[in-house]
Regions:
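Shared catalytic-loop signature of beta/alpha-barrel
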Residues: 68, 73, 229-357
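Conserved, mostly hydrophobic/aromatic
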Residues: 3, 44, 98, 111, ...
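Hydrophobic faces of well-ordered beta-strands that scaffold small-molecule active sites
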Residues: 49, 127-130, 155-157, 184-188, ...
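Metal- or metallocofactor-binding catalytic centers and their adjacent structured scaffolds
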Residues: 7, 40-109
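Glycine-rich, aromatic-flanked loop segments that form ligand/cofactor-binding clefts
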Residues: 97-135, 181
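Metal-dependent enolase-superfamily TIM-barrel catalytic cores that perform enediolate-based chemistry
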Residues: 124-243
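Flexible C-terminal active-site loop/helix
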Residues: 1-18, 25-34, 305-386
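Short beta-strand scaffold segments in enzyme catalytic cores
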Residues: 35-39
């Protein structure tokens, strides 16, 4: 089998309502933007992967540089092709969707979902509903009640108020109302806060992170996510030593060397690599093994796009150290209907657990006509896409 073509397209899928991400510095998203890559072969099998699309950088990088590196190559030799994919970071944003497409192709050729090719571990994984917006306490209480009614066992809340005590009051009230009926995780989204950076919420230092972590311990929170900048290894390790609450992060760390450092320095009890933002899916499988060797959990981050979620689900289902799966859920903008718009089959949830699809490859099939209906024509004069 040989690769005969590599095609990248920018795709916009409209959302049912505007989405205001906590991590987006006041941005409004009216659609899900994806770079979708298709890798075709001489045997008629096509692999599909997807990554971010802030502009045309990924499309151009794949259709020019990476395409030339992959043509006429054996798609099963992914480790041999991986250096070219990794080096593409110099020419584009996130090239990891290309490795995902290769594994999708291999799984289809073998007639097996990718997680089974790697030995397989889980057919179902408990989900936690992951919030993505800020809202009033009343709306968040209704959100949690909605999750409980659906059988979802856990919710991740965001801390983005300039005064962390205000966020803590919200978390205290939700804990008071729901008690042990729901598990709570908390995401501070501080990993991108580098020296001199500014955003819509304040940057934490170690004393602030320590104060918040100790307050969350009293509320029986499962973990505190990204309380400090991602490369502040000393600060993260110092925080982890001083508190009992597990510290989580790693969604945009990249390279086995960084994940080895995260595992060895003990700054994170839970590592959260992402097949869209961090690394290729099999490289993250190696990172998860590093985490396992250091008695840590590896729970992929999945807030990106629906194809990215399905890719991370295949990774998670292959891991013995992945007790939870992140389910992005912020209705009305981001609800489960989006998966039925993009895929022939939507996500299957059963008693608070996501069912891992057994369809060959990455477990999904795009709806007929989806690409044609949502493809954005390439305008060389327009770099950003809104």
């Amino acid at each position: 089998m040989r690769i005969t073509n590599v095609i990248a397209d920018l795709v916009k899928c409209p959302l049912p309502a505007p989405f205001y991400p906590t991590w987006g510095s006041g941005l409004q998203f009216d659609s899900v933007k994806m770079t979708i890559v298709q890798i075709e072969t001489d045997e008629g099998i096509t692999g599909i992967g997807a990554g971010p699309a802030t502009g045309w950088e990924n499309v151009v990088g794949i259709n020019t540089f990476l395409k030339q590196q992959l043509l006429n190559k054996d798609p099963f030799m992914i480790e041999r092709l991986r250096p070219a994919i990794s080096n593409a970071k110099l020419r584009m944003g996130w090239p990891w969707m290309v490795e995902a497409a290769l594994w999708d192709l291999v799984g289809k050729a073998c007639g097996q979902p990718v997680h089974r090719l790697w030995g397989g571990f889980a057919n179902e994984i408990p989900v936690y509903a992951s919030t993505g917006e800020l809202c009033s306490l009343e709306k968040r209480i209704q959100y949690v009640q909605n999750c409980v009614d659906q059988g979802i066992q856990a919710v991740k809340l965001r801390m983005h108020d300039p005064h962390p005590e205000n966020d803590l009051e919200t978390i205290r009230e939700i804990r008071r109302i729901f008690g042990s009926r729901i598990k709570l995780m908390v995401d501070a989204n501080q990993a991108d806060h580098l020296p001199g950076a500014s955003d819509i919420h304040s940057s934490w230092d170690l004393p602030v992170a320590l104060k918040v972590a100790r307050a969350l311990e009293k509320l029986d929170v499962v973990w505190l996510e990204e309380p400090l900048a991602r490369h502040n290894y000393d600060g993260l390790a110092a925080l982890a030593r001083k508190v009992d609450i597990p510290i989580a992060g790693g969604e945009k760390n990249s390279g086995l060397e960084e994940f080895r450092t995260l595992a060895e320095r003990d700054g994170y009890h839970i590592i959260q690599g992402d097949c869209v933002f961090s690394e290729g899916i099999f490289q993250l499988r190696k990172a998860a093994a590093l985490a396992e060797a250091h008695h840590k959990q590896f729970i992929p981050h999945t807030w990106s796009n629906p194809i990215g979620l399905m890719t991370n689900l295949q990774l998670a289902a292959s891991l013995p150290n992945c007790p939870w799966f992140e389910l992005p859920y912020e209705p009305p903008a981001w609800n489960l209907d989006i998966y039925t718009i993009i895929f022939e089959e939507g996500l299957e949830l059963k008693e608070g657990r996501i069912v891992v699809p057994d369809r060959p490859g990455l477990g999904f099939k795009l709806k007929e006509g989806f690409l044609e209906q949502n493809r954005v024509p390439h305008d060389p004069q327009q770099w950003m896409v809104r």
